[in-house]
C-alpha cells in the first residue's frame, strides 16, 4: 500500500454563501497541505467536516439535516460555520443540543479551531504531500472562476441580520495578501475573480485605510485603490474582476469610472433591501431612496453599460401597503437589471423580532410575488435591448446543445445565462473557461440566447 493510500481521509460538506465557500476552500487547502486526503463519499472518509449556514430558518434546518446525515452515514463529524456560533433561547449551542454526538463545534472563519479538532480525532500524517497544494490553494469552484474574500465580519447592525454576532466586526485582510492571492489565482488560470466580503465598500475602515505595499509600490487599504490594482492585474491575464456586496457609501462613486474604463466589470451588486425611509429606519439601513435614484442615474451616465444587482425584503415587520407600493415604484423607476427578493423571515437573535406589526406568512409571500412580477418585467425589458448586440461571454459549460456562458452582466449561480448555439465551424469551437464573442439573438426575463 502506498503512502497516499494510507493518508487519513476527510469528507467535506460545504453549505451557505460564497463567504462560507471560501472558508471551506481554506480548510481543505490546509488539510491537503498537512497530507490529509479528501473523500468524496461518507463511507470513504475517516471523519466528516460540515461547514454550515445559520442565517435564516431554512438554512438552519438544511445544516442540521446535513449534520444528521453525516452522523448517520459516517458517525464522526466536526461542525464549523455560522450555525456553530448560534445559541438557542436558553443560551445553549444549537448544534450540540440537536446532535450531541458531534465531535466538535466551531463558529465561522475558524481554520485553526477546525484543524485542532481534526488533529485531535484524526492525527495528521508524518510526511504530508505539501507539493500537491497549488499556490492558489484548493478551490471548490470551476477552474475558470474563483471567489476572493477581502475581509471578514461587518460593522453594520441591521435589525434583520445576525452576521456580526456570528462573524464579528469588520477585519480587513492586508492589501498585499489580497493582491498576492489574486495574482496566484490568475496564474492558475482563473478568468473571473469575484470579490466578496460582508461589506466590500468598508474595506480598510478598521485599519484606517493604512498604506501597504505591493510589487514595491504603496497601495492604500481602501476599496477604490484595491479595485484599481486588481483591475490592472486582471488586464495582464485578460481576466474579469467582479464586485459583490458593495454598500452604497459615497466613495462607491469613485469606482464607476474604473468600470467605464474597463478596469473592472461594469457590474455593481448593491444590497438596498427597501426603498421606503420608514422601513429602512426599522431595518437600521441608510434611508434616502430619492438620493439612491439620483446616484443610479449618475452612475449610468458615467457608465452606460452598468449592470446593477440588488436584494430586497418584502413584508418586513410593520410594512404597510403604502410602504410596499413605494418599493414597487422604486423598482420600476430605478430599472435595476438583476434583483432578488425574500419574504421576510424571522431570524433567531435578530432585533427585528421585537418590532411590532409582524405580518402573516401569506401577506409576506404575496408581496414577494408581486415584487418579483414587477422586477421581472423590468429585467425582460432591459435584456430585450441586448438583442442584436455582440457580447463577450465566458463559457461555463459545453454540451451537445452548444455552450452555456455568462456575460459581464451575469455573476455565477445568482444571475442569468447566455445559451449559445453549437459552433458552425471547427474554428469556432470553444470550451469551459474560454471567452467568446456572441451575437445575441433572443431574450426572456432572465436569460439570453445567441450564436458565435
UniProtKB/Swiss-Prot annotation:
S-adenosyl-L-methionine keyword on record: yes
CDD domains listed in its UniProt record: Radical_SAM
Cofactor note: Binds 2 [4Fe-4S] clusters. One cluster is coordinated with 3 cysteines and an exchangeable S-adenosyl-L-methionine.
Protein's cellular compartments: Cytoplasm
UniProt domain TRAM: residue ranges: 384-452
Broad enzyme group: transferase
Annotated positions binding [4Fe-4S] cluster 2: 154, 158, 161
Domain Radical SAM core: 140-381
One GO CC term, this protein: cytosol
Chief location of this protein within or outside the cell: cytoplasm
MTTase N-terminal domain residues: 8-123
Reaction it catalyzes: L-aspartate(89)-[ribosomal protein uS12]-hydrogen + (sulfur carrier)-SH + AH2 + 2 S-adenosyl-L-methionine = 3-methylsulfanyl-L-aspartate(89)-[ribosomal protein uS12]-hydrogen + (sulfur carrier)-H + 5'-deoxyadenosine + L-methionine + A + S-adenosyl-L-homocysteine + 2 H(+)
Residues the entry annotates as binding [4Fe-4S] cluster 1: 17, 53, 82
Cofactor field: [4Fe-4S] cluster
GO MF annotation list: 4 iron, 4 sulfur cluster binding; aspartic acid methylthiotransferase activity; metal ion binding; protein methylthiotransferase activity
SMART domains assigned: Elp3
Function description: Catalyzes the methylthiolation of an aspartic acid residue of ribosomal protein uS12.
NCBIfam families: 30S ribosomal protein S12 methylthiotransferase RimO (TIGR01125), MiaB/RimO family radical SAM methylthiotransferase (TIGR00089)
Family stated for the protein in its record: Belongs to the methylthiotransferase family. RimO subfamily.
Protein name: Ribosomal protein uS12 methylthiotransferase RimO
Species annotation: Cupriavidus pinatubonensis (strain JMP 134 / LMG 1197) (Cupriavidus necator (strain JMP 134))
Amino acid at each position: 500500500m502506498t503512502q497516499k493510500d494510507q493518508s487519513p481521509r476527510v469528507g467535506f460538506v460545504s453549505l451557505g454563501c460564497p463567504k462560507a465557500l471560501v472558508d471551506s476552500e481554506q480548510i481543505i487547502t490546509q488539510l491537503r497541505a498537512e497530507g490529509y486526503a479528501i473523500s468524496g463519499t461518507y463511507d470513504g472518509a475517516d471523519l466528516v467536516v460540515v461547514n454550515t449556514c445559520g442565517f435564516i430558518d431554512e438554512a438552519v434546518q438544511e445544516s442540521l439535516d446535513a449534520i444528521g446525515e453525516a452522523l448517520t452515514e459516517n458517525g464522526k463529524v466536526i461542525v464549523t460555520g455560522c450555525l456553530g456560533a448560534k445559541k438557542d433561547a436558553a443560551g445553549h449551542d444549537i448544534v450540540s443540543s440537536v446532535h450531541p454526538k458531534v465531535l466538535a463545534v466551531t463558529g465561522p472563519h475558524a481554520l485553526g479551531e477546525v484543524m485542532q479538532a481534526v488533529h485531535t480525532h484524526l492525527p495528521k500524517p508524518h510526511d504530508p504531500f505539501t507539493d500537491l497544494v497549488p499556490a492558489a490553494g484548493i478551490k471548490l469552484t470551476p477552474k475558470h472562476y474563483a471567489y476572493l474574500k477581502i475581509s471578514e465580519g461587518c460593522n453594520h447592525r441591521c435589525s434583520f441580520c445576525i452576521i456580526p454576532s456570528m462573524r464579528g466586526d469588520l477585519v480587513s485582510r492586508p492589501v498585499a495578501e489580497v493582491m498576492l492571492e489574486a495574482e496566484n489565482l490568475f496564474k492558475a488560470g482563473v478568468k473571473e475573480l469575484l470579490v466578496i466580503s460582508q461589506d466590500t465598500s468598508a474595506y480598510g475602515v478598521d485599519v484606517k485605510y493604512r498604506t501597504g505595499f505591493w510589487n514595491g509600490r504603496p497601495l492604500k487599504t481602501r476599496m477604490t485603490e484595491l479595485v484599481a490594482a486588481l483591475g490592472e492585474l486582471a488586464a495582464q491575464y485578460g481576466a474579469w474582476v467582479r464586485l459583490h456586496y458593495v454598500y452604497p457609501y459615497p466613495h462607491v462613486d469613485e469606482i464607476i469610472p474604473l468600470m467605464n474604463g474597463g478596469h473592472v466589470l461594469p457590474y455593481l451588486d448593491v444590497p438596498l433591501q427597501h426603498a421606503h425611509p420608514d422601513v429602512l429606519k426599522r431595518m437600521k439601513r441608510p434611508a434616502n431612496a430619492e438620493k439612491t435614484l439620483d446616484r443610479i442615474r449618475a452612475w449610468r451616465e458615467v457608465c452606460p453599460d452598468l449592470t446593477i444587482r440588488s436584494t430586497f425584503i418584502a413584508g418586513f415587520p410593520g410594512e404597510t401597503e403604502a410602504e410596499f407600493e413605494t418599493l414597487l415604484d422604486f423598482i420600476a423607476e430605478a430599472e435595476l437589471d438583476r434583483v432578488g427578493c425574500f419574504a421576510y423571515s424571522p431570524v433567531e437573535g435578530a432585533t427585528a423580532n421585537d418590532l411590532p406589526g409582524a405580518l402573516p406568512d401569506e401577506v409576506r409571500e404575496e408581496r414577494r410575488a408581486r415584487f418579483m412580477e414587477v422586477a421581472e418585467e423590468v429585467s425582460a425589458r432591459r435584456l430585450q435591448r441586448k438583442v442584436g448586440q455582440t457580447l463577450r461571454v465566458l463559457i461555463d459549460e459545453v454540451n451537445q446543445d452548444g455552450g452555456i456562458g455568462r456575460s459581464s452582466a451575469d455573476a455565477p449561480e445568482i444571475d442569468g445565462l447566455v445559451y449559445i448555439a453549437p459552433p458552425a465551424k471547427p474554428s469556432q469551437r470553444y470550451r469551459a473557461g474560454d471567452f467568446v464573442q456572441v451575437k445575441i439573438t433572443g431574450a426572456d426575463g432572465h436569460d439570453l440566447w445567441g450564436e458565435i
